[in-house]
């Protein structure tokens, strides 16, 4: 603009001095090439302006693209974060599922071990029955044959259970190996593992029922064996002979009624005088979880424990447990249950064990 203003007096106004002599300092403007130079300069300025505008527009577009790209990156980050969170939850759920499966397998393994122990006890009792069968006196050949046949059947059933338990142990081992490979398995394979565990649990329950039936048969065999051995022995029928005494397991009554029942049979409630007596009673009651009255009682906690014959209790064999310090109007009486002697109110109902001397002359 300043350059054009300087040009106005030269182009538009008459210069009085131009007639006589050339003006000083403006000899360049009066040359013939300044006009093309100005046009060229104006074009360059215009081109630069257009270039700047185009570049600014491109910069804005690039900025918008960068913002859109940044938004896409943020959205992808959120998606990736959600996917990672979902994957982590799935892994946690898988770990929890595997932990539950392992706990179930540990529980089943423990149950199998318990059943194996019970089976060993049954086998030992069966062996004792076989030995007692050989020592049975004055038993008829037919009775012995029937008992032996029943024992053979019991052995066969026990062997069958043993084989099935081995199969269950093998299945359990296979489940444990499958659990170690659970990370490679899909949800379908885990469902199959759970179904196998459910099937194994059902089989265990069935075997438990069968063992309970075998226990009952074993008890019946013991009672039948004792009856066969005592049919003409030193004890009356249905009584169990051991050393110098005969024993009878009687129905459930309170302590006083049980004592009267034993007296009516010319006997008394159980009295333990030796360690051998205690071991015999513990073995005879091991098959049952029911309580059995003994001939031991006292009127109140300040009185000593006395047997029916008036002799005091010797604590070298056992000690009583339970509420022995509590006072009852009917007194406190002792019963044996699960190999432990307890003290309780005499008015309660329990089974009883009658005891009397054996007629050893019949064995000579």
UniProtKB/Swiss-Prot annotation:
Name one molecular function that GO assigns to this entry.
low-density lipoprotein particle receptor activity
Question: Where does the source fall among the domains of life?
Answer: Eukaryota
Q: Which residues lie on this side of the membrane: Cytoplasmic?
A: 1-31
Which residues form each disulfide bond in the chain? 235-246, 262-354, 333-346
Quote the SMART domains the UniProt record gives. CLECT
Q: Where is this region: Disordered?
A: 1-21
The transmembrane segments are: 32-54
Q: Which residues are glycosylated?
A: 72, 92, 138
Ranges for domain C-type lectin come to 242-355
Induction (UniProt)? By hypertension. Up-regulated by shear stress, lipopolysaccharide and TNF-alpha in cultured vascular endothelial cells.
Key words, A-Z: Cell adhesion, Cell membrane, Coiled coil, Disulfide bond, Glycoprotein, Immunity, Inflammatory response, Lectin, Lipoprotein, Membrane, Palmitate, Receptor, Repeat, Secreted, Signal-anchor, Transmembrane, Transmembrane helix
Q: Where is the lipid attached (S-palmitoyl cysteine)?
A: 35, 45
Q: How does it sit in the membrane?
A: Lipid-anchor; Single-pass type II membrane protein
Binding partners and assembly: Homodimer; disulfide-linked. May form a hexamer composed of 3 homodimers. Interacts with HSP70.
PANTHER family according to UniProt:
OXIDIZED LOW-DENSITY LIPOPROTEIN RECEPTOR 1
What this protein is called in its record is: Oxidized low-density lipoprotein receptor 1
Instruction: State the organism named in the record.
Output: Rattus norvegicus
């Amino acid at each position: 603009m300043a350059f054009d203003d300087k040009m106005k007096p030269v182009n538009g106004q008459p210069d009085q001095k131009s007639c006589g002599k050339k003006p000083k300092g403006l000899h360049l403007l009066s040359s013939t090439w300044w006009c093309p130079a100005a046009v060229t300069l104006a074009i360059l300025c215009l081109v630069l302006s257009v270039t700047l505008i185009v570049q600014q527009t491109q910069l804005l577009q690039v900025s918008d693209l960068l913002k859109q790209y940044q938004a896409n990156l943020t959205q992808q980050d959120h998606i990736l974060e959600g996917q990672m969170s979902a994957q982590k939850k799935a892994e946690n759920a898988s770990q929890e599922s595997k932990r539950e499966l392992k706990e179930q397998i540990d529980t089943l393994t423990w149950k199998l071990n318990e059943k194996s122990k019970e089976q060993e006890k049954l086998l030992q009792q069966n062996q004792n029955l076989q030995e007692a069968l050989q020592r049975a006196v004055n038993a008829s050949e037919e009775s012995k044959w029937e008992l032996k046949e029943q024992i053979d059947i019991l052995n066969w059933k026990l062997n069958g259970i043993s084989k099935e338990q081995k199969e269950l142990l093998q299945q359990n081992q296979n489940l444990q190996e499958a659990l170690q490979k659970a990370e490679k398995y899909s949800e379908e394979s885990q469902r199959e593992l759970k179904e196998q565990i459910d099937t194994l649990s059902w089989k265990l329950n069935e075997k438990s029922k069968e063992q309970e039936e075998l226990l009952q048969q074993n008890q019946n065999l013991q009672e039948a064996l004792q009856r066969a051995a005592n049919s003409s022995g030193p004890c009356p029928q249905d009584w169990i002979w051991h050393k110098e005494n005969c024993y009878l397991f009687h129905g459930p009554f309170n302590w006083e009624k049980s004592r009267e029942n034993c007296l009516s049979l010319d006997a008394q409630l159980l009295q333990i005088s030796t360690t051998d007596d205690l071991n015999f009673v513990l073995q005879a009651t091991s098959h049952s979880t029911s309580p059995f009255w003994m001939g031991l009682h006292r009127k109140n906690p300040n009185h000593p424990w006395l047997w029916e014959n008036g002799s005091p209790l010797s604590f070298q064999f056992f000690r009583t447990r339970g509420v022995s310090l509590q006072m009852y109007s009917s007194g406190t009486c002792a019963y044996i249950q699960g190999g432990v002697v307890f003290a309780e109110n005499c008015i309660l109902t329990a089974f009883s064990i009658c005891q009397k001397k054996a007629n050893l002359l019949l064995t000579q």
